[in-house]
Amino acid sequence: MKKKLVLIIIDGLGLRLESQGNGFALAKTPVFDRLFQEYPNSLIAASGQEVGLPEGQMGNSEVGHLNIGAGFVVYTGISIINNALKTGKFFENEKFILAFRHSIKTGFPLQIMGLFSPGGVHSHQDHLFALIDFAANFGVKKLNLHLFGDGRDVGPKSIKPWIKMLNLKLKNYENYKIASISGRFYSMDRDKMFDRVELGYNALLGKAENTFTDPIDYINFQYEKGVSDEFFEPAINLKVNKKDFLADDHPVIFFNFRPDRARQLSHLILQTDLYEQKPKNPIKTDVFVSMMKYEGINCLVAFEEMRVENPLGKLISMAGFRQLRLAETQKYAHVTFFVDGGVELELENSDRILIDSLKVQSYADFPQMSAVEITDKLLEVGQNYDFIIMNFANPDMVGHTGDLKATIKAVEILDFQIGRICKWAEEKNFDFFITADHGNAELTEDENGNPSTKHTTFPVMLISSDKTIKLKSGKLANIAPTILDYLGLDKHPDMDHDSLIIKDK
């Protein structure tokens, strides 16, 4: 008889022994407590080299879901680009050179934009520093930087030392300037909040209510208003000539390598067919370089990604299983696009259900997010499927606020929903595996009681509802082979990692 299975991916829930600042350990979680005590479980590595990132680099949702679906370690953006820097191939990149030549030929400034931090989730400031040196050595005369404050994958107010480093570098180049600053809340939205994105976009054009002549002074001004890096109000540098802000035919390099939060701003600049929203102040440029491919955005791509040709969902579909993908808006792309290898696959016998995320200023005020509605939908339609991949977003998204009490509440709400799923699975003859894509909620306050808003390097869980099996520890790349093994299906030869189900000798 064909087994029916749910793969529950909890976003941003790692395992950490210390209870201080630990939104998981401090929460009341009777369901998780019972699962850990009574059911097969093991530890899963979800960061650093184990998921294709640099050593010590915290995991993230994109990389986590890619590895879960691939069955092998997927080397992504930061690792590919860092390797190009190490080998020197970065400084031979034809797409960058094309943008440089266009700037030199036309006399228009090169516009470089992206998330400015060492967070390594969406971008890395070292890549920007390398681009500046590359452009200068190639002969680019004018260069404008449009920096997005992070405050999420790094500390909430951590940008100043890096701006000071950047200013020291820019002193070497007469017409290289920080032209605009905005928070990622504006310039990197992914929830179709185009009213926000347009404010970030307008700053690229030199149109903003806020202005500055010294970036550090502006950052201090924002801090005095209680505004952290993530939420910097878009502002422009009065020392930059109006005609030198982004305009028709200016070459652009977007140095974010992760696509999901780069697509909307890229769409406004290029006016693609990806979204209906059009900018109120359109410009036209044919020289737009993205660091990696942004799905749905037709532009020059500096670095090619690793290809996942035979992800878990494809093999499940080929085996004749009817499958469902279920998540709320914040993580919908992750249980579809990313878990399928970073491409939009149309799979036979496969449905997708999107539950709308709440449109709010802060998820700390709504720690439940859409967890209840997701569970409701599973209980309503789940029995119609053989294999389900679902995601709960609230430990990660609430953890990103750095609000420990709200994170504890988010975990407690999640625990109750997992309990509902356990009962449903038993009634409907479903099995389930629970894992997570990376850590976050388990470290929401540092040792000094300050908010910690970033992901972590702690391992995550793998729990099975089947008491007849035993699990060994592994990494996210072991998840797909484990699922296939459990369902009695062969893994694809591309999957070089093994099942974590311990076989009797």
UniProtKB/Swiss-Prot annotation:
Catalyzes the interconversion of 2-phosphoglycerate and 3-phosphoglycerate. Binds 2 manganese ions per subunit. GO terms for cellular component: cytosol. Substrate binds at residues 122, 152-153, 184, 190, 258-261, 331. GO terms for biological process: glucose catabolic process; glycolytic process. This is 2,3-bisphosphoglycerate-independent phosphoglycerate mutase. Belongs to the BPG-independent phosphoglycerate mutase family. Mn(2+) 2 binds at residues 11, 61, 437-438. The active site is at residue 61. Keywords: Glycolysis, Isomerase, Manganese, Metal-binding. Pathway: Carbohydrate degradation; glycolysis; pyruvate from D-glyceraldehyde 3-phosphate: step 3/5. Its EC number is 5.4.2.12. It catalyses: (2R)-2-phosphoglycerate = (2R)-3-phosphoglycerate. Its cofactor is Mn(2+). The keyword Metal-binding applies. Mn(2+) 1 binds at residues 396, 400, 455. It comes from Mesomycoplasma hyopneumoniae (strain 7448). The gene is gpmI. Monomer. GO terms for molecular function: manganese ion binding; phosphoglycerate mutase activity.
